[in-house]
Design a protein with these regions (language model features):
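Extracellular pro-sequences of secreted precursors
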Residues: 1-198
Length: 198
């Protein structure tokens, strides 16, 4: 993590820090700390049914900050904020720990299964106003097992996935070759691994 942006906001005499990564969003539970997240669209192998995630070689650093600005109810352009959303139970707690890494719902794009990988490299203490940042890390994601259904057929133009799916490569696409998938299912080759280095 090379760094993040911080914009200070004063609400009723309390200074909050609005943190963000360029080009990415934040945690979005209303009233809870809007910590920045990194989101990557990853391709899933046709035969992968179980996802295993491990974080390796993580290096943490601690910083003192103001309270992290809470996520607010989204408003339409014509609406004005009437009430400031804040979870007092969360902000009066010693620690707020979201999942470091999570994978969203599986989707299908041009015949390729994919999902959003979300990384929130923070540990936050609202009471102490301290933030720990995982500034260096390696995320190892492996897929084991097989799906019961046959692999889908790739739609024409799947090369457009290059640049859309962060782990696009020939090995991933080969898992969607129906004949190859059937061959793989007759062997012990049932793992597909890759690393994300932050």
């Amino acid at each position: 993590i090379p760094g993040f942006y911080n914009v200070q906001t004063n609400v009723s005499g309390i200074v909050y820090d609005s943190l963000s990564f360029e080009g990415y969003s934040t945690l979005n539970t209303i009233g809870e700390p809007a910590l920045p997240v990194i989101t990557q669209l990853i391709g899933l192998p046709s035969y992968g049914s179980e996802c295993n995630i491990t974080i390796e070689d993580s290096i943490w650093t601690g910083i003192e900050i103001n309270k992290v600005y809470p996520y607010q109810t989204p408003l339409l352009e014509t609406e004005e904020q009437v009430e400031f959303d804040i979870s007092t139970s969360v902000y009066n707690s010693a620690s707020f720990n979201s999942d470091l890494v999570c994978i969203g719902t599986t989707m299908l794009y041009k015949g390729v299964k994919n999902a959003n990988l979300q990384i929130c490299p923070f540990r936050y203490s609202p009471i102490a106003n301290k933030l720990s940042v995982m500034k260096e890390f390696i995320i190892n994601i492996s897929f084991d097992g097989t799906d019961e259904e046959d692999a889908g057929v790739l739609l024409s133009g799947f090369e457009n996935l290059i640049g859309t799916i962060s782990n696009y490569n020939t090995a991933l696409m080969d898992t969607y070759n129906t004949a190859l998938v059937r061959s793989l299912r007759r062997t012990d080759y049932q793992c597909y691994d890759y690393l994300i280095i932050g």
